[in-house]
Regions:
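Sec-dependent N-terminal signal peptides of Gram-positive bacterial secreted proteins and lipoproteins
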Residues: 5-26
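Compositionally biased intrinsically disordered regions enriched in Thr/Gly
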Residues: 24-252, 260-263, 282, 376, ...
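Short, ordered beta-strand-loop transition motifs
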Residues: 36-39, 96-99, 179-182, 275-280, ...
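Glycine-centered tight beta-turn/hairpin loop motif at sheet-sheet or coil-to-beta transitions
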Residues: 38-40, 117, 286-292, 298, ...
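Short helix/turn-capping signatures at newly exposed starts of structured segments
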Residues: 71, 229-344, 380-388
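Long, charged/polar, surface-exposed segments that mediate recognition or autoinhibition
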Residues: 103-111, 117-158, 295-356, 361
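Short, exposed beta-strand-loop hairpins at the edges of beta-sheets
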Residues: 363-365, 369-378
């Protein structure tokens, strides 16, 4: 009995310590700073650093981890060697999430090891409560089952779709580097394993809803703290979240917004295929896991790319606050979003003109934009479109 009482006391103490850690983070102003070194127009090393933690030792530990995860010290040393000639640039994206997590990616491009230009994608997924690097197994209830499910999805769904657009196309084994994004698990591959035709390191994002059966969605788990629950489950709050995001001209997980320059986006992400025509103009497919089965809609390019902007975003894969392509039924979203502002039948002729299948489209007006939800003849969501 004494042993059991002691265990209970220790468990309570551990719970209190976790609560204290959470409170201390909430009460401090934690920020992410851009740090780096610019030696020339061709040599620029930039990386993130976390500041503002009450625990200075923890802050140092986290920043050391960020540099280690992303090879920053090696890049700084290499930059010094290239002063007399050569190119090396790093850039990062990410930051602190609401759940006290630091998530970032670093892209390094140039003469990283030899004079031959190449690219490396790396990432950091750090729990700010204790500074530990989040492991893949922390995301799942059964890691072995999750790995099997991921590999099956990569080989059966992704590989056939992308193989013609890749220089190196080994989607398995699962790479070590990954990013815990709000909308899915993004895998970052070594360039020798998976690379695009433009010789850039490949990445693949798998929507969390595709792995729903094995996700650890416990209350204080990593994915719950990341906000994955609200992204894959349709709930009463989904309508307001959709309105908030779409009112900004965006869809979750897509690094483009309505009004963005098509020229700048194609320069940054590169074309996967030549622009395809549709009833309203052209559809752009870009390289990278964040754009898989996602298309940017614009005009007919009569004035040239440099004058064209994004007029719409179309997702044929992914999830937006419970609207999961290939899974959510029309009756389900009607029960949460209510009746649409308008609706239309999509005939075979209309479907062919828009590169979609026959069915129905529901239109919801949110601010300056219109959310279009396409369902097939069986009532399953097949595409999400946000347009002007």
């Amino acid at each position: 009995m004494k042993c059991i009482r002691r265990i209970r006391q220790l468990s309570c103490l551990a719970a209190v310590l976790v609560m204290i850690a959470g409170c201390s983070l909430a009460e401090t102003e934690i920020r992410v700073e851009d740090r780096g070194l610019d030696l020339s127009d061709e040599i620029s090393i930039h990386y993130p650093a976390v500041t503002g933690l009450a625990d200075a030792e923890l802050e140092e530990q986290i920043n050391d981890r960020i540099q280690q995860d992303n090879g920053i010290r090696d890049y700084l040393a290499r930059a010094a060697q290239l002063i007399s000639g050569g190119s090396l640039k790093t850039e990062w994206a990410g930051g602190i999430t609401d759940g006290d997590l630091f998530i970032c990616t670093v892209s390094a491009e140039g003469a990283l090891e030899t004079t031959r230009s190449t690219q490396v994608l790396t990432a950091s997924n750090i729990d700010l409560r204790d500074g530990h690097e989040i492991r893949l197994d922390e995301l799942f209830t059964d890691e072995a089952a999750a790995r099997e499910m991921i590999e099956s999805y990569l080989e059966n769904e992704v590989a056939p779709e992308l193989s013609a657009h890749l220089q190196n196309s080994e989607v398995t084994p699962i790479p070590e580097a990954f990013v815990i994004e709000l909308t899915g698990l993004r895998l970052l591959y070594p360039v020798k394993q998976l690379s695009t035709l433009s010789d850039r390191a490949g990445d693949i994002r798998i929507g969390w809803y595709r792995l729903r059966e094995v996700l650890d969605l416990s209350e204080d788990g990593i994915l719950s703290r990341r906000g994955v629950n609200e992204m894959i489950d349709l709930m009463p709050e989904s309508a307001e979240k959709l309105k908030g995001t779409t009112a900004e001209g965006r869809l979750p997980g897509i690094p483009a917004a309505i009004g963005d320059s098509m020229q700048e986006l194609t320069d940054r992400y590169h074309l996967l295929t030549d622009p395809d025509g549709y009833e309203g103009g052209r559809m752009f497919a870009l390289e990278g896991g964040m754009f898989r089965k996602t298309y940017l809609l614009t005009d007919d390019l009569g004035a040239g790319w440099e004058n064209s902007t994004v007029q719409g975003i179309r997702m044929d894969e992914g999830c937006a606050y419970g609207l999961c392509v290939g899974e959510t039924l029309r009756d389900e979203w009607l029960s949460v979003l209510c009746e649409p502002d308008s609706e239309a039948e999509i005939s075979e002729e209309k479907a062919e003109a828009n590169r979609i299948v026959p069915g129905k489209c529901d239109y919801y007006n949110y601010g300056d934009y219109r959310l279009q939800l396409y369902s097939d003849e069986g009532g399953t969501l097949i595409s999400i479109v946000l347009a002007e």
